[in-house]
């Protein structure tokens, strides 16, 4: 059976922590930032853990991550 291919677009969006969990960026911090508060922009800058419901989809797209 051939190796599974990694979806490169998905591989660029996630990073693995030291404990093996996946982290992702938050949505909403690319443009239209002038009306958002500084606190909101700061909180959007942090990375969050991928939820348990999405973990299956991400691991299918990036099997070797």
Curated annotation (Swiss-Prot):
Residue ranges, compositional bias (Basic residues): 21-44
Record-annotated membrane-spanning stretches: none
Pfam families found in the cross-reference section: Ribosomal_L35p
GO terms under biological process: translation
Keywords from the UniProt entry: Ribonucleoprotein, Ribosomal protein
Any one GO MF annotation of this record: structural constituent of ribosome
InterPro entries: Ribosomal_bL35, Ribosomal_bL35-like, Ribosomal_bL35_CS, Ribosomal_bL35_sf
Disordered: region residues: 1-46
GO CC field: cytosolic large ribosomal subunit
Family under the similarity heading: Belongs to the bacterial ribosomal protein bL35 family.
Name under which the protein is recorded: Large ribosomal subunit protein bL35
Native organism: Gloeobacter violaceus (strain ATCC 29082 / PCC 7421)
Taxonomy of the source species: Bacteria, Bacillati, Cyanobacteriota, Cyanophyceae, Gloeobacterales
């Amino acid at each position: 059976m051939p190796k599974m291919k990694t979806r490169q677009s998905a591989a660029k969006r996630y990073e693995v922590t030291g404990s093996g969990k996946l982290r992702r960026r938050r949505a909403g911090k690319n443009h239209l930032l002038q009306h958002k508060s500084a606190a909101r922009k700061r909180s959007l800058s942090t990375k969050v853990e991928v939820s348990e419901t999405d973990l299956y989809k991400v691991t299918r797209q990036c099997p070797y991550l």
